[in-house]
């Protein structure tokens, strides 16, 4: 009876994880799911775009604290173009080609951009930079640029270093403050009533990542946190089709 119980629980958890993984995200363009929690936005090729959206809207009336790992590639010079974490109410199929990090032109939207290429037309700095930019507008002199640009990594001009970097996005609903951290260090923050000023009073948004390459390119990826609803022993693997032990 004990063995039957273990098998039954294992099968139940596998079903839950399978449904959770396959139904949770929509993948567009060049983007592809690499593993249960890892997504590629662009390959190392020119003029690509990709986006990955969570299918479940979140309510900006509530606070959130999202943690990811991001990979911006190995190519520093040449290398391009970057990625964006985006909040938008439109759909799970939006995204643009070419320059603009796959985010340009999406409106209404809130984007935290990680830009690895200096585009003069957007008044980009020479270093890899992070900013908070609204409504798919990437020009840093625009009123839609509400924080940054500053170095994406504190004290380091280059984020295309072949390393995974921790990206944390915190939204504090009572104070209407959004903050981004890279590798545990606060980089940009802004106070803005997104629901009233940007989203026409509707607090429900999709969240996701976009990315693009242009004439230069990089492999660009992100990882989500694994399913937090169950607690596992250290080293326990939790991907779909991998065995669960107790």
Q: Positions of the model-derived regions?
A:
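Polar, low-complexity loop segments and adjacent catalytic/binding residues used for recognizing
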Residues: 23-229
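Bacterial Sec-dependent N-terminal signal peptides
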Residues: 1-25, 239
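A detector of low-complexity, intrinsically disordered, Ser/Thr/Gly/Pro/Ala-rich segments
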Residues: 1, 20, 94, 208, ...
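Proline- and Ser/Thr-rich low-complexity, intrinsically disordered segments
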Residues: 230-246
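Compositionally biased, low-structure terminal segments
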Residues: 18, 195, 231-233
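Generic N-terminal initiation segments characterized by hydrophobic and/or small/turn-forming residues
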Residues: 8-14, 98, 191, 243
């Amino acid at each position: 009876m004990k063995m039957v119980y273990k098998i039954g629980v294992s099968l139940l958890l596998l079903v839950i994880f399978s449904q959770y993984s396959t139904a949770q995200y929509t993948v567009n363009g060049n983007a592809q799911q690499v593993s249960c929690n890892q997504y590629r936005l662009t390959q190392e090729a020119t003029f690509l775009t990709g986006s990955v959206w969570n299918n479940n809207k979140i309510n900006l009336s509530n606070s959130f604290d999202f943690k990811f790992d991001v990979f911006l590639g190995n190519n520093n010079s040449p290398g391009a173009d970057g990625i964006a974490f985006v909040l938008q109410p439109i759909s799970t199929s939006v995204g643009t080609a070419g320059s603009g990090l796959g985010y340009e032109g999406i409106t209404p939207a809130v984007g935290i951009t990680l830009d690895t290429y200096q585009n003069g037309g957007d008044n980009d700095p020479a270093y890899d930079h992070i900013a908070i930019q609204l409504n798919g507008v990437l020009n840093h002199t625009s009123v839609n640029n509400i924080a940054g640009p500053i170095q994406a990594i504190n004290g380091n001009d280059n984020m295309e270093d072949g390393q995974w970097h921790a990206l944390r996005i915190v939204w504090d609903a009572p104070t209407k403050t959004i903050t981004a951290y890279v590798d545990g260090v606060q980089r940009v923050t802004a106070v803005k009533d997104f629901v009233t000023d940007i989203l026409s009073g509707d607090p429900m948004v999709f969240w996701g990542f976009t990315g693009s390459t242009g004439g230069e390119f990089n492999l660009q990826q992100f990882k989500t946190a694994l399913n937090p609803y169950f607690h596992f022993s250290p080293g326990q693997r939790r991907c779909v089709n991998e065995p669960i032990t107790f």
